[in-house]
């Protein structure tokens, strides 16, 4: 109880130091988090049989590697170091990997067995091996059939100088030189498997004298590395399918970095690669920056010509890739060359270019951050991955994000203590909560309807208010007119003096009343005027 199953992925995580050491031997760097992500989430989606817990099956690893190295938008350059390291663990397994390595059956032997004559009985019992490269020479006659056809384009190399670093080996003791066999140098160090162009296939010497071994590029016996030069089609495709170094140094640098990691080129191959992909001025600039990156024993850039020439020579050096020392020189040379490409690709400092990088309407925060970092690398002398530059990159990320994301990031609590990773995570949350175009359209339509409804209600309210105010004014006016007429009547009555009971109201004399007043004219009485009333219709 309590036991957990061990998987290839968990095994690599438990021995992460060994994984990093293997990656360093391949001139690459790996990170644990991305290692887990690619193994458990990315590679299973390639539909090549990769399990979520990882595998050391070389066939499945090869299928994943083909997907990763696919040209164009279907490739995954960022996953190259990880699949290369995983392949190295499967090809040259450490002790803790060997129990998980799938034995590789001799698939090449059965198809060619019917065409071979019957083999003589062996004097010793046959021994089984996990690695076909370590099988007995008597059982490996059909191996030369795996190599490319001798009638291929390699025939043109007969007229050229021999390729670099060929180790012809010492002459045989009996003085008989055989072009098909090369005697191994005694005491030569055991070579470790490498990828692609320097393939560490261990092929036994071929005893069949009818198989041509005149080409040094096909030398594969006795643990020697096989050498394949760049094909003209590869160089042509790389040059025509990628922008120039001056136009987009980042993209071309990524291509050359991928080639350096996967093909493990020699010094001559590097010169051929630079001469094809770069102009003369660009190549000189790259070489100059690479020589500036050479470090001395104290770890600082050195100015000593001897140290610089030893680490990054301008003329063809005497480095043998069949020896550990020669391979170490080549690994260091490729690292310096990559540093020279990165430094030469930086444009003059132009902070305006960096400030001009803004987040697109539908661009994710992670993609925007990558563009922002690339602008820092290209237009400034600062490294965005440097912890000392994290504050500047964070501020640029906030200010140049989309308006809705930037406003919410500025209102975060304890903003000064937030790391760049924290800001990216918060921005991702805000970005993922954005409404879809359909939701946005529905919201705009709903807001428009609500606005129209509010406008109509406001118009009705104002109309009612105007009517109420008009009625109130008319009522006041009517009340004023009626009140004035009433006051006129009452005022006339109040102006009449008080009369005695025997006093005339007309002449004010006593002794008679107004109807009997002799001074009052006796004519027909006119009609009494009527008070006129105003109505609302008037």
Swiss-Prot record:
Q: How is it modified after translation?
A: RNA-binding phosphoprotein p12 is phosphorylated on serine residues.
Q: Where is this region: Interaction with host UBE2I?
A: 430-435
State the organism named in the record.
Friend murine leukemia virus (isolate PVC-211)
Kindly state which keywords UniProt assigns to this record, in alphabetical order: Capsid protein, Coiled coil, Host cell membrane, Host cytoplasm, Host endosome, Host membrane, Host-virus interaction, Lipoprotein, Membrane, Metal-binding, Myristate, Phosphoprotein, RNA-binding, Ubl conjugation, Viral budding, Viral budding via the host ESCRT complexes, Viral matrix protein, Viral nucleoprotein, Viral release from host cell, Virion, Zinc, Zinc-finger
Q: Where is this site: Cleavage?
A: 131-132, 215-216, 478-479
| GO cellular component annotations of the record | host cell plasma membrane; host multivesicular body; membrane; viral nucleocapsid
Q: Which residues form a coiled coil?
A: 438-478
- One GO biological process term: viral budding via host ESCRT complex
Q: Where are the residues of the annotated region Interaction with host PIAS4?
A: 345-393
Q: Which domain of life is it from?
A: Viruses
**Keyword Metal-binding assigned:** yes
Protein name in the entry = Gag polyprotein
Residue ranges annotated as compositionally biased, kind Basic and acidic residues, are 434-466, 486-519
User: Which residues are annotated with the PTM Phosphoserine?
Assistant: 192
For bias type Pro residues, the affected ranges are 111-124, 161-173
- Give, as residue ranges, the zinc fingers classified CCHC-type: 502-519
Outline the segment boundaries, as ranges, of region: Disordered.
Answer: 111-218, 434-538
A molecular function GO annotation: zinc ion binding
